[in-house]
Regions:
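Aromatic- and glycine-rich beta-strand/loop motifs that create alpha-glucan
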Residues: 1-25
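Membrane-interface helix caps and helix-loop-helix hairpins in membrane proteins
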Residues: 200-208
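Transmembrane alpha-helical segments in integral membrane proteins
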Residues: 70-87, 162-183, 221
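Secretory targeting signals
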Residues: 29-76, 107-172
Length: 235
């Protein structure tokens, strides 16, 4: 299986995705740093940070922007690796190999999932680390509500990253059903609106039950994406 995953990375030129992730992560890090220490979120009259409900601490902003960016980025990769292959018929050639269709499709999904999970975790660690380092020299506009010396911090970071990247399988299912890369990407934006919305002072992102529900739904949609691929007509 890992050989197939490596083949997918090589075939789709994973280097360009690494470059794009590095640029995206750097931009998010700079934005969060400016948000925290350069006062770009402060009210010009009062000097008080004007944050959205549920985002009064810096970790909420970090999770919000990294989740949005990587949910869309993962969906874009899935649309390139899988949905576009269905659309332009190159999947026909791949399915002519003496390998089960399900195994090929799973390897493509895992290639995207592993890449984005690792990238998301590293991006979060970079941002949290930079914000913590900045606190040694500057005063933050937002409370630093995390402790990088705590094991709980890393467990929570990993779990949230798993949920976000896995959610992209919902967008993949929609894109495959419609045979449309655009549908995959648009679905990822809709997922962002649904999961990161604020209702009054209540933030859906902070709901303890929501990640579990999303994880179960994502796995169901991932299963549905590969369930009947052995007999599915590609035309």
């Amino acid at each position: 299986m890992f050989k197939l995953i490596r083949l997918e990375w090589k075939k789709n030129n994973v280097g360009k995705y690494i470059r794009n992730v590095v640029i995206m992560s750097a931009l998010i890090c700079l934005f969060i740093f400016a948000l925290c220490y350069l006062g770009i979120a402060n009210d010009p009259d009062t000097g008080v940070p004007d944050a959205a409900p549920g985002n009064s601490a810096i970790s909420s902003s970090i999770e919000l922007f990294t989740s949005m960016a990587f949910l869309v980025f993962t969906s874009v990769m899935l649309s390139t690796y899988i949905v576009s292959a269905y659309k332009n018929k190159t999947m026909n050639l791949m399915f002519s190999y003496p390998i089960k269709r399900q195994k090929i499709l799973v390897s493509q999904m895992l290639a995207v999932w592993i890449f984005n999970f690792v990238a998301l975790v590293l991006t979060k660690l970079l941002i949290y680390g930079c914000i913590l380092l900045g606190s040694q020299f500057m005063v933050s506009s937002f409370p630093l509500d995390y402790n990088m010396a705590s094991m709980g911090f890393y467990i929570q970071l990993l779990l949230k990253s798993v949920v976000i990247v896995t959610m992209s399988f919902i967008a993949l299912f929609i894109g495959m059903a419609m045979k449309s890369s655009k549908a995959t990407i648009i679905s990822s934006f809709l997922l962002i609106f649904l999961t990161q919305a604020n209702v009054g002072d209540f933030s859906l992102a902070d709901n303890a039950i929501l990640p579990v529900v999303l994880m179960v739904l994502s796995l169901i949609f991932a299963f549905l994406s590969i369930y009947n691929v052995e007999t599915k007509d590609l035309n």
